[in-house]
A protein has these predicted regions:
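Conserved, structured C-terminal
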Residues: 22-205
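Gly/Ser-rich phosphate-binding catalytic loop and adjacent alpha/beta segment
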Residues: 13-19
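Single conserved hydrophobic/aromatic residue that forms the stacking wall/gate
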Residues: 1-11
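Short loop/turn motifs at secondary-structure junctions and domain boundaries
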Residues: 12-13, 96
Length: 205
């Protein structure tokens, strides 16, 4: 399966979220969300657009393993074939009976992986296995506001952007294609911003 980065549900000029879209099968998708909820919004879009889809929140818990030695730790856990997992691609794995989705993504601007646990009852077991595998590499728990993410210019929803921010203010112009034939939510609002210009822009110091 493959992943793509989204600006996340731009509505009336505002960013509601900045998720990663995972494609698990031809018609099976996950939105890996930032620090906000879009479940009811997505359900409302589906109903009002007449889409024949089922939208639900799965029993999935994400955990990230990031850093220059993350691949060596992943090899200890999953074997050598994990080295072949390309950036923004995913695979299904079983780790001693624990069902997982592993993607070559992360929130650190470093080599890293996201591990999606598909059975919440196995959370402690998974965590301990990862910490044991990473002990010789000095593995430590971290969080989304680590300095590596900030230095890499990776934005965190709520910390760096919110519902009052538009993509052009964040320098996300490269992710917006206003010339595409397909319509999408927020397209007209984004066209207007593009024509009028912005009054502020976020920069890193």
């Amino acid at each position: 399966g493959k992943l793509s980065r989204g600006l996340g549900d731009v509505y009336k000029r505002q960013i509601l979220n900045d998720p990663v879209l995972l494609r698990l099968a031809e018609n099976h998708f996950w939105l890996s969300l930032a620090d906000s909820d879009v479940l009811l919004w997505a359900q409302g879009v589906a109903v009002n657009s007449g889409l024949d889809v089922k939208i639900s929140e799965p029993d999935v818990s994400p955990l990230q393993l990031q850093g220059p030695t993350s691949q060596e730790i992943m090899v200890k856990l999953f074997g050598e074939d994990i080295r072949d997992l390309k950036y923004y691609w995913l695979r299904e794995y079983q780790l001693d009976g624990i069902p997982l989705i592993v993607s070559r993504t992360g929130w650190s601007s470093e080599l890293g992986y996201e591990i999606y646990l598909r059975d919440g009852s196995k959370g402690n077991e998974l965590y301990e296995k990862i910490m044991a595998a990473g002990k010789e590499h000095g593995i430590q728990p971290g969080h989304t506001s680590s300095i590596r993410r900030i230095e890499g210019g990776m934005l965190s929803y709520h910390a760096d952007a919110d519902i009052h921010t538009n993509p052009f203010e964040l320098g996300f112009d490269r992710l917006i294609n206003l010339d595409m034939k397909a319509n999408f939510i927020g397209k007209e609002a984004l066209k207007k911003i593009h024509q009028e210009g912005i009054k502020r822009k976020q920069v890193g110091l």
